[in-house]
A protein has these predicted regions:
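Short, solvent-exposed linear motifs at loop/edge-of-secondary-structure regions
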Residues: 99-115
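EAL-family c-di-GMP phosphodiesterase catalytic domain
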Residues: 1, 6-7, 29-32, 110-114, ...
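Catalytic-core regions built around general acid/base machinery
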Residues: 93-100, 123-131, 177-182
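Flexible, charged surface loops at secondary-structure boundaries
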Residues: 66-72, 99-101, 129-130, 151-154, ...
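Bacterial c-di-GMP phosphodiesterase EAL domain
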Residues: 1-99
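Distinct, well-ordered alpha-helical segments
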Residues: 86-98, 117-125, 144-157, 204
Length: 218
């Protein structure tokens, strides 16, 4: 079983202990590589990797459709390709959910996927909104964030990947610009992910974020 879970948690000044909001379900690419093709870099060919993730999407949906684990019936996020959302398999998954559960499911999308076919994304977005899902844009760094108009694109959440270079800013200019972009997108809409240290959380707090994900949070 290559499926993994990682909580997305709220951390506030009033309550510094992480409070789970939902959990991300994902298939570990690294574990898959080690077990199937240990000598091959799955990330070396972007389009091959996307094809692989589409296959893994379908596997994940099948697991969720047939699961008997009540802990993953709701309050989850799953990372899918736009093509998967437009597939019969996603319709089957949608039909398997209770109506009340859909609003607790976050569908995460990658920038390269949505911007490679905006028409398909907008169709998928409108369908997901109609069905009650929340939508997150995953895989953002501090350089990409400035170009994202969250409301116009129709995302409920943005996931910003922490990296130490984000804090390497002696002048404070980068932090000020990043805070401006975060304020524009909405502080409550931001998840600071890949938090592997206390520094990551402190930096997120300097942006006004209260939602975090990563090994340090675990």
């Amino acid at each position: 079983n290559l499926m993994r879970r990682q909580p997305v948690c709220a951390i506030t000044p009033a309550n510094p202990n992480p409070q789970p909001i939902f959990q991300e379900l994902y298939i570990s690419i690294d574990e898959l590589r080690k077990s199937v093709v240990p000598d091959f870099d799955l990330l070396s060919n972007l389009w091959l990797f996307r094809h692989l993730t589409q296959t893994l999407d379908l596997r994940m949906l099948q697991v969720l459709i047939h699961n008997d684990d009540s802990t993953i019936d709701s309050s989850i996020s799953i990372n899918l390709n736009v093509k998967t959302i437009l597939s019969p398999e996603f319709i089957n998954f949608d039909n398997s959910l209770k109506a009340s559960s859909r609003g607790t499911v976050v569908v995460e999308l990658q920038p390269i996927d949505i911007f490679s076919d905006m028409g398909a994304y907008m169709f998928a977005r409108d369908f997901m909104r109609e069905r009650g899902y929340r939508i997150a844009l995953d895989g953002l760094n501090h350089q990409i964030l400035q170009f994202i108009d969250r409301e116009h694109l129709g995302f409920d959440l943005l996931k910003l990947f922490w990296s130490p270079e984000m804090a390497d800013d002696n002048s404070g200019t980068r932090l000020a610009e990043l805070k401006e972009h975060v304020d524009r997108c909405g502080r409550a809409r931001l998840i600071v992910a890949r938090c592997d240290s206390d520094e990551a959380v402190r930096f997120g707090q300097s942006l006004g974020s209260t939602v975090y994900q990563g090994r340090y949070i675990d």
